[in-house]
Amino acid sequence: MKPQEGSSNPTRKRTDYYPWWLDNLADDVTGEGAAIQGTIQGAEAVRRVVLDARKVYENQQFQFTGNYGDNGFLEEYTCQIQGQPNRVVVTVHRNAAGKAQHLVVNHRPRSSVLLFARVMGEKYAGTPLAKYFITTGC
C-alpha cells in the first residue's frame, strides 16, 4: 500500500504504520490538538512531539489512513495511554509542495485528552515544550 492510499478494511488493522508526513514536514509546519495549549511551530518541535507521543501510545492500531480532498490526509487509530483507552483522529494539510503544513491531533474521550496532556507535561517539564501541556503538579 502506498503511503497516501486509504485503508479502512477492518481486517487490516495496522500496527506497523509509520506516518509518511513525519519525514516530509514543512519547515514552518504547525501542530495543534485537544491536549495541546496553543500551536506548536516548526518542524523540529512538531517532529519531537509526534515521536514522543508514539512512545507513550500502547497497542496503537490504525483503522484508517488515507487522503481526503486535494491537500488533506487522515489517520484514525486506537491506543492506550497508561492502560486507558484512547481514540485518535489526525488531520494533515499539505502545502502546494506536498509537505505537511498543518497537523491537528484529536484524542478522545476527554479523560484521555487530559491524561495525555499530563503525561507529555511531565515529559517536557523544564523544557520549552512544557508550555503546551499540563505541567501543574509535575
Features from the language model and the residues they span:
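C-terminal and inter-domain tail/linker signature
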Residues: M1-C138
